[in-house]
């Protein structure tokens, strides 16, 4: 409702007359709204508060005000993101924030050559299987690090292939790529972009890419932003799954990563860059035309 928006969002930053003119409503109507029974406004506010708390819980306590505000109509209410932000503060809830520290999983001190950067930080794609982004991260456990290799389709942000291992051997990256190929059956010409790590520069990886007609692309040395979309994916995984959680065994971590990728990230988690839908929903909508 426009009157509620004026009261909650505009009245403290401009005059009522100016706010009413901007939203094409009358000041007299606004003042009548303010005199309406307090109970009705309170009921609406409580409904919004309940919806905000519910959506935050359903998102695994991950979503911030913008995504929660976008999801409110699903529960039959609406509110500006600033109102949602205030409600979150009042209830002591907030989105998880990412940590900036990241250990090195790139082993670039090898004798293999490096391929040129074919993307130049341009991750935009006009369809599926144009640009695949690849990288390796780690998940700490009481049994030692578990390494996770992933392949993302830049078009939909879908994780099309992934693999886990207790070592940084090239096998973990190759298995993720094989999963991606099996799932997508891509045409020849896909750009496979990664860092310069030995897992991607080795002969085994180059042969696999050649077998499937893929063009190899690598970030420049020391430029993590050349693969920023994958770096962002790993930061999201760490924020939502790893930080503040202790995995006692490799198996426990494997199961948690599987659930995060295949159930949460792919099918449920909404992405602002995809129009606030999940990767799976984005691809389904594209197929439906």
Regions inferred by a protein language model and the residue ranges of each:
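Charged DNA-binding/catalytic regions of mobile-element recombinases
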Residues: 1-289
């Amino acid at each position: 409702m426009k009157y509620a928006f004026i009261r909650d969002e505009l009245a403290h930053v401009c005059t009522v007359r100016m706010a009413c003119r901007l939203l094409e409503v009358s000041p007299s109507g606004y003042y009548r709204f303010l005199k309406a029974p307090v109970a009705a406004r309170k009921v609406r506010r409580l409904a919004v508060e309940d919806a905000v708390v519910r959506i935050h819980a359903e998102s695994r306590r991950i979503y911030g005000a913008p995504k929660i505000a976008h999801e409110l109509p699903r529960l039959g209410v609406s509110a500006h993101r600033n109102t949602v932000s205030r409600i979150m503060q009042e209830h002591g809830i907030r989105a998880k924030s990412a940590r900036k520290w990241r250990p090195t999983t790139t082993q670039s001190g090898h004798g293999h050559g490096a391929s040129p950067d074919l993307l130049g930080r341009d991750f935009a794609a006009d369809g599926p299987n144009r640009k695949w982004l690849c990288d390796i991260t780690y998940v700490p456990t009481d049994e030692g690090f578990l390494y996770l290799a992933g392949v993302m389709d830049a078009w939909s942000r879908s994780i099309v292939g992934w693999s886990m291992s207790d070592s940084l051997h090239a096998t973990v990256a190759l298995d993720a790529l094989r999963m991606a190929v099996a799932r997508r059956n891509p045409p020849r010409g896909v750009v496979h972009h990664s860092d310069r790590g030995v897992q991607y520069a080795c002969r085994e990886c180059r042969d696999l890419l050649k077998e499937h007609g893929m063009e190899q692309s690598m970030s420049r040395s020391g430029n993590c932003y050349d693969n920023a979309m994958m770096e962002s994916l790993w930061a999201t995984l760490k924020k939502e799954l790893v930080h503040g959680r202790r995995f006692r065994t490799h198996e426990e971590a494997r199961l948690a990563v599987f659930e995060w990728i295949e159930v949460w990230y792919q099918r449920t988690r909404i992405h602002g860059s995809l129009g606030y839908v999940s990767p799976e929903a984005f691809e389904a909508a594209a197929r439906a035309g």
